[in-house]
Amino acid sequence: MAHKKAGGSTRNGRDSESKRLGVKLFGGQEVKAGNILVRQRGTKFHGGENVGMGKDHTLFAKTAGKVKFEVKGPKNRKYVSIVAA
C-alpha cells in the first residue's frame, strides 16, 4: 500500500502589518494646528519651531502655517518647522 509520511511543519508564514510610517506632509504644504507631519521610530527628524513631539516620536504642528524642512547643526540633523503663512 502506498503511504505518504507526514510532512514537517515550516517555520515561515508570518508577516507583521505595516506601520504606515514616514513623512505625511511635505515642504511648502499648508497645515493646521494638530496636523501630523512625520510618523517615525526614533528621531529621524527633529522638531523645529512650532512643532511638537508625541511620546512615539510623532511630529505635529502646534500652529497653522507652512511646513519647512531644513538640515542644520554640526551633526547635520533634519529639522521640521512650521513657518507662519
UniProtKB/Swiss-Prot annotation:
UniProt keyword annotation of Ribosomal protein present: yes
Q: Which InterPro entries match?
A: Ribosomal_bL27, Ribosomal_bL27_CS
The superkingdom listed in its UniProt entry is: Bacteria
Q: Which UniProt keywords apply?
A: Ribonucleoprotein, Ribosomal protein
Task: Give positions of region: Disordered.
Answer: 1-22
Gene Ontology MF: a single term? structural constituent of ribosome
Please give the biological process terms from Gene Ontology that the record holds.
translation
Name a GO CC annotation attached to this entry: cytosolic large ribosomal subunit
Family as reported in the entry's similarity comment: Belongs to the bacterial ribosomal protein bL27 family.
Protein's name in the database: Large ribosomal subunit protein bL27
What is the originating organism of this protein? Teredinibacter turnerae (strain ATCC 39867 / T7901)
Which gene carries the instructions for this protein?
A: rpmA
